[in-house]
Regions:
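Charged, low-complexity intrinsically disordered segments
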Residues: 1-140
Length: 140
């Protein structure tokens, strides 16, 4: 899907790239942001799992240089905006994804979050934004 002037292979790629969006064009940090885009054809652009690792919040991330920090304000609400924008672009512009979403009818949509080895319980996260987008599509 296309969003913010770039092509993205998944919402995961867009979401994690948004953590590094507010840097000056041409800077090393902005170049890191561009690695997530489909047109970069980089290793990270081809694998949502790598996108998650590159954009990881913990100190064990394997791919991101330590001096490349995520935007200070990302988790002050911008993370929610990025997720909804990415999902909206995906479902509004990709016919197959839209069809699959609509086939879920009125089901509660949840995402399983595994926290194995982190000392925390795994949990189900309700995707309210996705259900909101589905409702909008049904009302078209």
């Amino acid at each position: 899907f296309e969003l913010d002037g770039h092509m993205w292979n998944s919402v995961e790629h867009y979401y994690h790239a948004c953590k590094f969006k507010n840097y000056t064009e041409g800077s090393e940090k902005h170049d890191f942001y561009l690695k997530f885009t489909a047109e970069s054809n980089s290793e990270v652009s081809k694998d949502p799992g790598k996108a998650k690792s590159y954009g990881g919040t913990d100190s064990s991330h394997k791919y991101r240089p330590k001096h490349i920090l995520m935007d200070d304000d990302f988790f002050n609400g911008n993370h929610k905006i990025a997720m909804e924008k990415g999902q909206r672009a995906k479902y509004m512009n990709d016919a197959h994804s839209q069809k699959v979403l609509l086939l879920t009818k009125n089901a509660k949509l949840v995402h399983y979050t595994s926290n194995r080895g982190k000392g925390q319980a795994s949990k189900l996260v309700t995707f309210f934004d996705t259900m909101k987008i589905r409702k909008e599509l049904n009302n078209k």
